């Protein structure tokens, strides 16, 4: 701590959770991280200058001094930025990748930047959004994420499998991690694993040579890239975690690697702009309700065609009744010969009606339907207040199926 050579040289890096040597000490080094060779030099230095030879005590002292002089390189970088006042977040993805400059693209990138900043200053904070850059093979999507990480050591694209026992070590020391094509090649089970993985705020594991495992709060965010347009699995409920942005390289102002230094300077100023928003405290790490609604609709452009939902929508447009049930839709909309449908088939129809169809509202109390459906739960058409009133004297006409439920006399039904 007081040695003129070592003072301020040994620090704990809070991003990598390793000890760094941050200034020259008189021997060749090619990495800031403390190595076994560094330890040997330090032992020799302490022996020659102080007569100390107890290796364990010296190593323990190095660990204590490093911890008292800890630093976070990402936070230091962000705190040192000075914004020049020029807006760049809105135009960055268009400049380098040809994306739109609309509010959605702006909000998507802004949210991702603020999530990354928050994870640096408040490790483990809740943030489960993945910015997904889609299309444009060779456009520079991966290069964008790499340059966005500022320092190549803070970037990784080596996270290929989430069930790898070394997955946590591959995350260690990185600020921005790209998952290239991981979602596009995932099946339903692995998509759920990705969702769960993105939702985590910490990992519990033991660093080699440590005695006890510890909670490691996440300091990174995840970006996705895909050349496949329908990279998202079919999910009628939508998924707030995946935020797709289409790239059009032919519309880009400049390729991000055409002048890497200029691109880095632009991105640094974009981080400075994001830091102004972060310091103001006027932000949330999630979309507004209106933007969430837009996201849900927008995600459908990146999913396989939902043919069953289309069949049901076509049927409902032609259907004149006011109630439907899942078995009715199974037979009449999807064209199955009527027999007892499997439960997963009924659940799929329920999913479509509740998430992909508008103008119909579910009812939970079973009602009577014509044969062969009989007593079922289902959906009723939502009446539009602007629809013409075909009733007389203020009374509305009751549909036949509702009259049947009321148990009205058969002659009344015949008169109708």
Language model segments and positions:
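Conserved alpha/beta core segments of nucleic-acid transaction machinery
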Residues: 277-321
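Conserved AAA+/SF3 P-loop NTPase catalytic/coupling segment centered on the Walker-B
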Residues: 176-198, 232-238
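AAA+/SF3 P-loop NTPase mechanochemical coupling elements
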Residues: 167-172, 207-225
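A short helix-turn-beta junction within AAA+ P-loop NTPase domains corresponding to the substrate/partner-engaging
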Residues: 234-252
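Conserved catalytic/switch belt of AAA+ P-loop NTPases
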Residues: 191-214
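DNA-recognition alpha helix
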Residues: 326-338
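N-terminal nucleic-acid engagement/recognition segments and initiation subdomains in replication
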Residues: 1-91, 103, 107, 339-340, ...
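P-loop NTPase catalytic core of nucleic-acid-dependent motor ATPases
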Residues: 62-172, 176, 334
